[in-house]
Amino acid sequence: MTNIRKTHPLMKIMNNSFIDLPAPSNISSWWNFGSLLGACLVIQIITGLFLAMHYTADTTTAFSSVTHICRDVNQGWIIRYLHANGASMFFLCLFLHVGRGMYYGSFTLTETWNIGIILLFTVMATAFMGYVLPWGQMSFWGATVITNLLSAIPYMGTDLVEWIWGGFSVDKATLTRFFAFHFILPFVILALVMVHLLFLHETGSNNPLGIPSESDKIPFHPYYTIKDLLGLMFLLITLMILVLFSPDLLGDPDNYMPANPLSTPPHIKPEWYFLFAYAILRSIPNKLGGVLALVMSILILAIIPMLQTAKQRSMTFRPLSQIMFWILTADLLILTWIGGQPVEHPFVTIGQVASILYFSLILIIMPTVSLFENKMLKW
């Protein structure tokens, strides 16, 4: 008799996706991040659901309701900190996942890559709106500054900003709609993840050598299920250490002050995972130019497949490209650091140099180096 998991319409889909899926025999731990991101999403949806049971999306009570969750709700503090730090782990895994894709040439699977970029934008939008909900000083001013950027759009900018605000400033209407969007978007992300996996399973995974692996596949279960469980264990241990020992390490102290439209914090800055983009935004003196650079800093990922000049897919055997890749990584770390610094000398100059280097590396330097490596293959 055939196993039910191979015949039942629903279980058959699960089986072909997570059990009998033929996977390359040599994928390394860098391929763990997909499952870790799935785990992060599940953690965020579950903790978020429990937070939403006690949260009130109203300017007068939002801050108090978050305090109430931490003080009065059973295990409320751990749910709140799991959700806040879970977002940090989510973005850490996202950046490593995208970096893996760039290093090993996974962007040649263009459909999967493009859905991934849409996912990245959606997750960033969700995280931004979630940061506004506690209605602390940084929540309010972050919302004001970031939504205000849309006013740089010619002709319709101001109308667009007021439409998003639901009034003439960030107020009750803004908070209510942000909560509504923050609640619904994770389910949109869930749907996009399914599309992401659908496209991935059309072609099969890439591998560290960047070569076809049809001739040497192994079943996903038990080999990669156990490997993913090991990665998940590391993720959960890291998350729990963060939550239980220093839950506010990655947060901003200003957000423990209730939102006050009459008092601007000395340094308005987003959470750490947006700092690199924020630094690029600030490095351009022109408002519209800054907004375009901000959007392009992520959207540039979409043109990476077109900039592929190398004859080898992966960077495994391309030492010069490897050096450029790690310079790009260092550059992003510098931008992250600069995004959290005040707008003064020498940080402004460092930010401008790092921003120019970021775009130059992706658009000019890395494709040129790849061409040079193609020549080296003939020597």
From Swiss-Prot:
A ubiquinone binds at residue 201. Component of the ubiquinol-cytochrome c reductase complex (complex III or cytochrome b-c1 complex) that is part of the mitochondrial respiratory chain. The b-c1 complex mediates electron transfer from ubiquinol to cytochrome c. Contributes to the generation of a proton gradient across the mitochondrial membrane that is then used for ATP synthesis. PANTHER family: CYTOCHROME B. It holds the Pfam family Cytochrom_B_C. It comes from the Eukaryota. Heme b b562 binds at residues 83, 182. This is Cytochrome b. Keywords: Electron transport, Heme, Iron, Membrane, Metal-binding, Mitochondrion, Mitochondrion inner membrane, Respiratory chain, Transmembrane, Transmembrane helix, Transport, Ubiquinone. The chain crosses the membrane at residues 33-53, 77-98, 113-133, 178-198, 226-246, 288-308, 320-340, 347-367. Belongs to the cytochrome b family. Changing residue 78 to V: In strain: Isolate Jorg 64. CDD domains: cytochrome_b_C, Cytochrome_b_N. One of its GO terms (molecular function) is metal ion binding. It comes from Microcebus murinus. Heme 1 (or BL or b562) is low-potential and absorbs at about 562 nm, and heme 2 (or BH or b566) is high-potential and absorbs at about 566 nm. Changing residue 324 to I: In strain: Isolate 00-016A-8EBC and Isolate RMR 24. Heme b b566 binds at residues 97, 196. The lineage of its organism: Eukaryota, Metazoa, Chordata, Craniata, Vertebrata. Changing residue 2 to A: In strain: Isolate RMR 24. Its cofactor is heme b. It is found in: Mitochondrion inner membrane. Binds 2 heme b groups non-covalently.
